[in-house]
Structure formats: structure tokens, C-alpha cells
Amino acid sequence: MRPWTGSWRWIMLILFAWGTLLFYIGGHLVRDNDHPDHSSRELSKILAKLERLKQQNEDLRRMAESLRIPEGPIDQAPASGRVRALEEQLLKAKEQIENYKKQTRNGLGKDHEILRRRIENGAKELWFFLQSELKKLKNLEGNVLQRHADEFLSDLGHHERSIMTDLYYLSQTDGAGDWREKEAKDLTELVQRRITYLQNPKDCSKAKKLVCNINKGCGYGCQLHHVVYCFMIAYGTQRTLILESQNWRYATGGWETVFRPVNETCTDRSGTSTGHWSGEVKDKNVQVVELPIVDSLHPRPPYLPLAVPEDLADRLVRVHGDPAVWWVSQFVKYLIRPQPWLEKEIEEATKKLGFNIPVIGVHVRRTDKVGTEAAFHPIEEYMVHVEEHFQLLARRMQVDKRRVYLATDDPSLLKEAKTKYPTYEFISDNSISWSAGLHNRYTENSLRGVILDIHFLSQADFLVCTFSSQVCRVAYEIMQTLHPDASANFHSLDDIYYFGGQNAHNQIAIYPHQPRTADEIPMEPGDIIGVAGNHWDGYSKGVNRKLGRTGLYPSYKVREKIETVKYPTYPEAEK
């Protein structure tokens, strides 16, 4: 008897068992027709699992064929190795099937999640609208009307918090919360593997590279976003990002003295040819491309925010309320991995400040932004939203203390906040506020301070700030990497979220609207609206691109238009 014969019989037995498992799964799929609601929810996931099983079955078939060597001398060792590999693959398949059988749900459908978020947004927009209108009424008549208006606002707030609490529990029911947790983790790990693969090519001397200089003339948050923009272009054009950060205005030793290097194996920018950015197609044969700041970028590639990868879009829409922010956050996550000394510094600051949850993060930007990019907002404006969210948190958790992490560049604000709100516990480091002043801003101590502020703001349960500040937006982005979906965990006193240099932010009308005042614009379902901002009173401002008219429209009558781009998928990262 030839030595391969026993192995071949064993292979046939494995394939038979594999076929039986496929038949078993198929049988479950057929039986699920008796429960159409459950089947429709599970169908796409089951089909995906079956497709993977079929692929593994095909792999087994090819491995079996490689063992069928009818002529020539036989080497028993490789055959035994292949058999062991088959055994391991079969065991893994059995584990996958057992896990699948135990899993009662795999999350809800995309439409369910979109509707849930629409209800949530609609309730919030209704609240903003009623608050605004009733506050106007308070000034029209005497004390009686004012008292009734106050009571009505209080009752209305109670209703709104009840709706939001119910929606939260809806999002966690029937295993949906567990599914969202796992799906977000899987997506994050997938993207981080792809980035790591791109940043560490096998042969650095032959790799295509994109060079980015960190020293854009602006503050830390702005410079970090500059590097994120470079990274997204590098990822889209399949070029390894080379970050030039020597003589960084915050740390002369460069980025790597604070954060882990963006590359482990490829830090050299040298190449056979070098050129300035002239477009993905024109730069095809240029090995090293230098990228300008986004303000000077021409031509503009499709990889800029707010676009997301086409291959991930459907999964992202299901799991996250703002896929564009999630996508940006993945590059931030990779970039700000701390060096050991910084990690230790964060741990020590956490203990020293007594940072604990629940806590709401408040970022108050004064100094250079006020009067230029942002208006002045008193602490009372922030605390209204802090109080509202603590009342909401109290519906679903024990709130032992009402803690607020206060980050500001105004050293006098901490004392003011403590005086005006004695029932709150304010966590803050005034030395950071002093270091954030204009005269101290570009120092290593200032860098330490802004990193700590952003860290603690991102760790909060909710964020109240002005999105005109890059520090606030960075904290919000990092927050997305700490939760499956933290897209709604903020209130901005001014702008909606944006990324400097982004492409147009568009929405799609889902309800018709007829203007009641000259300030409003008409809409029909399907109209594309270029959004300029949310007034947080039930109305947003934008342009109806079909009509070319700019004005106000009810925020609840539109939905976000998700822009997708055919990014590379880096299959090599999975090998």
C-alpha cells in the first residue's frame, strides 16, 4: 500500500465531516423560514458565514489534491504536516459553528439603526426648537406666563429624557449592545492592521512614500489634524507616510519623543525620484511625494473627509452614528499611541486629580479664538447642558457626584465655576490653563498640558464644548475609539463637527418643506442640501443645491449623505 493512501482516506473523512457541517448549517437556514422575522434579520450574516465555510471547503479540497501524488517517491513528513493543518482547520471550523449556534442575534439591520438614530435626533431637535420658542414667550408677558413657561420647559425636559433613556435601552436590547461592541472592535482591529501593514513595507528602499512635515503654523490640535490629513492621503494612494518632525515647535526632538513612531521599519524618505504633489495619477511613477498643507492642495484627491471607505461603509452605517468621524478617529488612534513616559504621566495625573466616572468634560476656549473664530460663551451656557446630561445619566446609572472635568486656557475660570456651582465637583489643573496661554503655548510643558486635557475630555461620559476648537474636536475623535458609538456624546455651543479642508458636507431631504419666512428655503424629498451649520434651535442653515438657494430648514427633515470612496483594501494585511 502506498504511504499516501491512509492520509488520503483520512482527508476524505474530513471532507465528509465538513460537508455534513455545511449541510447542518443549511438545514438551519431552511428551518428559519418558519420564523420570517428572525430569518430576515439573520439572513445576510448567515450567507456571509456560509460563504466563508465554502471558501474554507475549497481550501481543504486544494490541500487534499496536493496530497494525491500517485507517482514518485513519497515524503511522509510533509503529508503528515498537511494532515495536521487540516485537523487544525477543521477544529477551528467546529469552534466557529458552535459559537454561531450559541449566538442568539448578530445585531439589527442597517435600516433599524438608521431609524433609531433619526428618532433620537428628532427628539433632540424638537427639544431645541421648543426651548427656543418658549424662551421667546417668557419675555412677552408678566410673571404668570413666565412661571407657566418655566414649568412647561421642566416637564418637557422630563419627557425628552424619558425618550432618550428608552432609546438607549432599545439600542442595548436582544444582544444588540454586545453585537455593536464586537463589530466596532472588529472594524477597529481591521483598520489598524491595514495601517500597520502600510507603514511597515517589506522593502523600504522600494516603497512608495508620502512625506508630511508637521510644522504647520498652528497649534497642537491643528497640527495633529494636519498629520491625519496626510495619513489619509497616504492610505488612499498606497504610500507609506514619512512624518518629518525634527525641530517641532512643541518638542524639538520630534514626534517620536512623545508618541510612538509612525513607522517601525521604514523611516527613511529617500527614493529614486522625488516630487511635489501633482495628483495621484501624475505621481504614479514618482517614488517619494511631498504633500503640502490642505489649504494649498491641488488637485484634491477623493480621500479627504468626510468620505469613508466603500468596503466598510455598510458596516460603519450600522454600527456608528457618524462614520466620517469614526474613520478620522482611526488615524488619530494610530498616531497618538503614547511613549512609556507619557503613559506613566497620564496614569499619575489621573490619580492626582482624582479623575473618576461619571464625569462630563467641559472645554472652554478663550484667548486667541474669541473674537476671530469663535464668540465668547460664559460658563453658564456650558453648565445648562452639563445639568441636562447629568439628569439623563441619573436615569440609567448611579450618579454619586456631579463631576466636571474643566479644560480651559483661562486660569480664572476654575474659581468662577466653583463659586457659581458649589454642588459640582470640578476637576482641573490650573497649571495647564497657565501653560495654554499665548505666551507659553509652544513649549513642552504646554504640549504635556494639552495632551492631558484632551485625554481626560475624551474619557468623559459626555462632552460640552465649542467645535470651532480643534482641541475639542480631537477629544471627540478620540472618544469614538473608546466606545462602539459615541457620536451623540457631545453638545457644541457653536459649530457642528467638521474637519479642516474637508470636502462638502451634504445632507438629503427626507421630508418636503415650504418656507414660512423669507429666511427659510424650500425642499423636496431627495434634494441635496449643503449644510453650513446647526443653530441648535430646531433649524439648520444650508444651501439647496438644486435651487441654489441658501437659508434655514428644519433639521429633522434631512438625513446625512454618506460619501464613499474606493479606498485600497490591503488584503496583504490579513496574511
Swiss-Prot record:
Residues 365-366 are annotated as: Important for donor substrate binding. It holds the Pfam family FUT8_N_cat. The keyword Repeat does not apply. The chain crosses the membrane at residues 10-30. Its main location: Golgi. Catalyzes the addition of fucose in alpha 1-6 linkage to the first GlcNAc residue, next to the peptide chains in N-glycans. A motif (SH3-binding) lies at residues 299-305. Residues 1-9 are cytoplasmic. It comes from the Eukaryota. One of its GO terms (biological process) is N-glycan fucosylation. It catalyses: N(4)-{beta-D-GlcNAc-(1->2)-alpha-D-Man-(1->3)-[beta-D-GlcNAc-(1->2)-alpha-D-Man-(1->6)]-beta-D-Man-(1->4)-beta-D-GlcNAc-(1->4)-beta-D-GlcNAc}-L-asparaginyl-[protein] + GDP-beta-L-fucose = an N(4)-{beta-D-GlcNAc-(1->2)-alpha-D-Man-(1->3)-[beta-D-GlcNAc-(1->2)-alpha-D-Man-(1->6)]-beta-D-Man-(1->4)-beta-D-GlcNAc-(1->4)-[alpha-L-Fuc-(1->6)]-beta-D-GlcNAc}-L-asparaginyl-[protein] + GDP + H(+). Belongs to the glycosyltransferase 23 family. Tyrosine phosphorylated by PKDCC/VLK. This is Alpha-(1,6)-fucosyltransferase. One of its GO terms (molecular function) is SH3 domain binding. GO terms for cellular component: Golgi cisterna membrane. Keywords: Disulfide bond, Glycosyltransferase, Golgi apparatus, Membrane, Phosphoprotein, SH3 domain, SH3-binding, Signal-anchor, Transferase, Transmembrane, Transmembrane helix. Disulfide bonds join C204-C266, C212-C230, C218-C222, C465-C472. Its EC number is 2.4.1.68. Residues 502-563 form the SH3 domain. It is found in: Golgi apparatus, Golgi stack membrane. Residues 31-575 are lumenal. It is an enzyme of class 2 (transferase).
